[in-house]
From Swiss-Prot:
GO cellular component: cell periphery; extracellular region; fungal-type cell wall; plasma membrane; side of membrane
UniProt KW Cell membrane keyword: yes
Keywords from the UniProt entry: Cell membrane, Cell wall, Glycoprotein, GPI-anchor, Lipoprotein, Membrane, Repeat, Secreted, Signal
Protein name (Swiss-Prot/TrEMBL): Cell wall protein DAN4
InterPro entries in the cross-refs: SRP1_TIP1 (IPR000992), Yeast_SRP1/TIP1_CWP (IPR050788)
Record comment regarding domains: The number of the intragenic tandem repeats varies between different S.cerevisiae strains.
Single GO term (MF): structural constituent of cell wall
Organism: Saccharomyces cerevisiae (strain ATCC 204508 / S288c) (Baker's yeast)
Composition-biased stretches (Low complexity): 354-372
Family designation: Belongs to the SRP1/TIP1 family.
Amino acid sequence: MVNISIVAGIVALATSAAAITATTTLSPYDERVNLIELAVYVSDIRAHIFQYYSFRNHHKTETYPSEIAAAVFDYGDFTTRLTGISGDEVTRMITGVPWYSTRLKPAISSALSKDGIYTAIPTSTSTTTTKSSTSTTPTTTITSTTSTTSTTPTTSTTSTTPTTSTTSTTPTTSTTSTTPTTSTTSTTPTTSTTSTTPTTSTTSTTPTTSTTSTTPTTSTTSTTPTTSTTPTTSTTSTTSQTSTKSTTPTTSSTSTTPTTSTTPTTSTTSTAPTTSTTSTTSTTSTISTAPTTSTTSSTFSTSSASASSVISTTATTSTTFASLTTPATSTASTDHTTSSVSTTNAFTTSATTTTTSDTYISSSSPSQVTSSAEPTTVSEVTSSVEPTRSSQVTSSAEPTTVSEFTSSVEPTRSSQVTSSAEPTTVSEFTSSVEPTRSSQVTSSAEPTTVSEFTSSVEPTRSSQVTSSAEPTTVSEFTSSVEPTRSSQVTSSAEPTTVSEFTSSVEPIRSSQVTSSAEPTTVSEVTSSVEPIRSSQVTTTEPVSSFGSTFSEITSSAEPLSFSKATTSAESISSNQITISSELIVSSVITSSSEIPSSIEVLTSSGISSSVEPTSLVGPSSDESISSTESLSATSTFTSAVVSSSKAADFFTRSTVSAKSDVSGNSSTQSTTFFATPSTPLAVSSTVVTSSTDSVSPNIPFSEISSSPESSTAITSTSTSFIAERTSSLYLSSSNMSSFTLSTFTVSQSIVSSFSMEPTSSVASFASSSPLLVSSRSNCSDARSSNTISSGLFSTIENVRNATSTFTNLSTDEIVITSCKSSCTNEDSVLTKTQVSTVETTITSCSGGICTTLMSPVTTINAKANTLTTTETSTVETTITTCPGGVCSTLTVPVTTITSEATTTATISCEDNEEDITSTETELLTLETTITSCSGGICTTLMSPVTTINAKANTLTTTETSTVETTITTCSGGVCSTLTVPVTTITSEATTTATISCEDNEEDVASTKTELLTMETTITSCSGGICTTLMSPVSSFNSKATTSNNAESTIPKAIKVSCSAGACTTLTTVDAGISMFTRTGLSITQTTVTNCSGGTCTMLTAPIATATSKVISPIPKASSATSIAHSSASYTVSINTNGAYNFDKDNIFGTAIVAVVALLLL
């Protein structure tokens, strides 16, 4: 989410009142507009510094004013530094980044509208389609001239592609094939949701020629999918007056647009054929047509969680090496251009593009206007239709907050929050004599919006009885967009809405106990000792995805209040960076006397090369092998393996020469090896060692020389070792890179190996990629992670039985020392929409005839979670009374059951300790003085009253997942395409207890059982006869998690009370440092029934997952602690039952693809 907090300082430069009351139309490059745009741009760089860092590395020729870098690292009033930058320079910088449409435009529009500035270019025309069930608010047609500039990054990458002038002509033909496909495919996802198809399909036109950028402007066809009815106004009018049993599930807007937002970067596949062979480009163009719905995310998706998920994208660049052993010299390098699989797997870039736009505007002008003006049913909110300078008109990019407080005898709280550019969340609370909860949640794109009300709705939240007729209402609801968002919905690009209400108008829980045994002994215990919880949460947007910033909770509470911050470290962890480096060989390398083909090994080392041997001299003289290595930025590394029928020779010396290609983003390195014929053969090379200082143009914000404490350096080394003897093949590579910024030091090393014995058909691989991130902020911490991958797979051709085993183990460790603050709430949203495209090459052999099929498998997985919470509260009060010297104990149990439905959200703590669900246990001990008189004798006793309040929430999650798989099979020369829809309904019930961030008082015991049933309909045709099969896929997943709390207690106070000769000792303890150990075992058994020719076969694919975590919480006065956990270590074993030989191991990478692979049978 873009932090626009600096805009507050910019607005002071403009006229304050006059500019807001009257709408002014200014020239596009007015000085105020420049300053506001630059403030948003600088704030966005701070919030996504590594994303800009990566962008600058791929566009080194771009220049930036030195004032930008100075402003990024100057947290004071930096606005005066930016006054000298021209409007054209501002437009070039801001619109040149790929996330301009999705993130910068809404933020700039919001910032400009707050200053009363609305810019428009009236020459363009557009059509608006608004979907809303409550009111039709027409949005004005505004276009921007600089929205299509997002296509410029494609031209820079493609410039490296053509090695000869002839090859550059062939890719242009592929453009014609991509243009029509975009229109046709855009109709396909219309059924699911509009926002997927729209516009900006221009980015997929990768051809190097600049003319291609003009062809896709006919994106008006994408207006049809505006049927997205994102039922934002699904007002689920759950205004159930009584708070009890209002289990109305807010299943609102599960229409979550499967916003195929993956921006599948398939366009980059056209840059892969760096080896001048043109035949490869034609195949890649067909691949890019499959996910034609790719470019949508650049138009609308307010990819809120893209900051955290972008890091994990590099993990999917795992592997492929695809080359056959055909002894060809030139065509060998073309075969492995199928490495586009690694690029298409970058689907997690927009894994959580929670688009809430309900209105899409497609215009005939070069820019697409997207209006997220969303009409709401609240009459208090005036027009949301206001022209904005950017091409995405957001009527109210900042949520319009209207708080109405009605003062009456029965205090009512009515707060209405409307957010347009984000999921509209309307929360209405009415508090009367009996606290009535009326929660109205309206979610548009996905049920990702969260309304969390930390209010004293529980009738014990009042430490002072306010008896005045006028409600004493504390409503923390500030509308400021500063980084210290206190209880305010600050949602422009991230649909995380949090509302906190604190009110002291709640009734006092009064427990009136009358003993009937003796005359007139009345004990009135009024539980008015519980405090008013008034918490102000101050959060600061993270500077980067590594989350080195730390927030503080400032809480004003009574002595008995506990500000329980919740923690999350399981699923959403932005600092968990997993980089996989897998080596996969698709063919066997045998000994021969021919010049071998090249093998491509893809790792995420940031280096892409293709090596091809060019000459080989006979053994009578010194052997000389020369190879040319072409490097680019596609994160791959390629080496050549030389085979020989005679004893292989080691190279004795090598010369390396490197040169840079200034016209593009690649460099060329040439390596020549010399050897004597008496030694065995091997290849050893060291690649790419570079370092830069703070003035290097390759580093983002390198002009920060004005800041003496800032320094930037990059060091990257890569070594590889390949040896082939006459009987075995062994490959190993290592890569180490590190860079230092003003607040971070990151180092990454990747070590991978591959081995295969020619006498065996089994090859093995292993890789390790440890990562270390050290923070240089005021809270010093070091975070390290390591991913170890290993596996065995068969590489023999023409084998009908294949077994593959893959094991992945990831470990994370966080060490935090001397933090200024311990814990702060941070909202996260758990709703996910992802599109995955996997291209699989299957070789089938029958009767000595082998056929290779290229089967694209597209998986669309849309998830929407609805949580129904049932809360049981049991209050047990024990009162001891002693009338007439006889003591009796009376226990008064009070059970309260509350049920509410809410969209799922996770509250994470800064140290990412644990996931939390709203479960709370309180222990309250009061000391009461009771005077009892009987027969003229009075006795005063100190009676301790212990109240135990145990709350346990049962969360029931119902998840509907629809996976549509397209499979192409060829039999007898006839190919047919099957579309297999798989609908998965998962239901889980989880009962958990709370782990508190501060004191970790409780144990956790969680048991989860989920039953997964998928029913697949497959139609198979053979010889003109079609058969429809109903293939049930059942999966049973049982998870058990236990968390033990070994706690050391520290005595705090000992109190002795004596009365009437009887003494009572009361000891109060404080919880010491706790250590949690969590272990879990999950076994998923998937059974697939396949029927063919009247014979049915059942295949079972077990997946075992074991997790173990050790958690040491950070106390409030933290000195040093360590948090370590190891993520899932899983093993997948699949037997194909003699059907096909899957020669790409990444089929088994995920469970869903494993099921798809079985369905291929």
